[in-house]
């Protein structure tokens, strides 16, 4: 019967009874574990103390001096004076992409696969 991978169902009510021999097998009924002895008040207090510590750290950063106007770069110059040729950068990027495409088109010979 086990050779054809089919389940057999029995109509015998004694074999299918919930209190049959299967009671000793498998998982038993869930046992309630005793609860931890930690009240909600203790948990809230620990969270509040952590929040107070974080607020203290933020207060240290509030005393920053204003930014001096001499430190602000005028004209939107964000490359520290370096001139960027965007056309050349685009060509370089295209060349790199072409190299990646070459790898995708590679088809191994049958001799390479026999190693």
From Swiss-Prot:
Start-end of Low complexity biased regions: 11-21
GO cellular component: nucleus
Domain of life: Eukaryota
Disulfide bonds: none
Primary site of residence: nucleus
Region (Disordered) residue spans: 1-115
Record InterPro entries: Histone_chaperone_domain_CHZ
Keywords: Chaperone, Nucleus
Pfam families: CHZ
Assembly information from the UniProt record: Forms a heterotrimer with H2A.Z-H2B, stabilizing the association of the histone dimer. Also, with a lower affinity, forms a heterotrimer with H2A-H2B.
Biological function: Forms a chaperone-bound H2A.Z-H2B complex that acts as a source for SWR1 complex-dependent H2A to H2A.Z histone replacement in chromatin.
Listed name of the protein: Histone H2A.Z-specific chaperone chz1
Source organism per UniProt: Aspergillus clavatus (strain ATCC 1007 / CBS 513.65 / DSM 816 / NCTC 3887 / NRRL 1 / QM 1276 / 107)
Gene: chz1
């Amino acid at each position: 019967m086990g050779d054809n991978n089919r389940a057999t169902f029995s109509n015998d009510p004694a074999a299918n009874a919930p209190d049959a021999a299967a009671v000793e097998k498998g998982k038993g009924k869930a046992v309630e574990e005793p609860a931890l002895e930690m009240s909600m008040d203790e948990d809230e207090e620990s969270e509040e103390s952590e929040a107070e510590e974080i607020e203290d750290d933020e207060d240290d950063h509030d005393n920053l001096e204003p930014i001096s106007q001499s430190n602000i770069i005028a004209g939107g110059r964000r490359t520290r004076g370096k001139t960027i040729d965007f056309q050349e950068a685009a060509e370089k990027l295209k060349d790199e992409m072409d190299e990646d495409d070459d790898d995708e088109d590679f088809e191994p010979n049958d001799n390479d696969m026999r190693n």
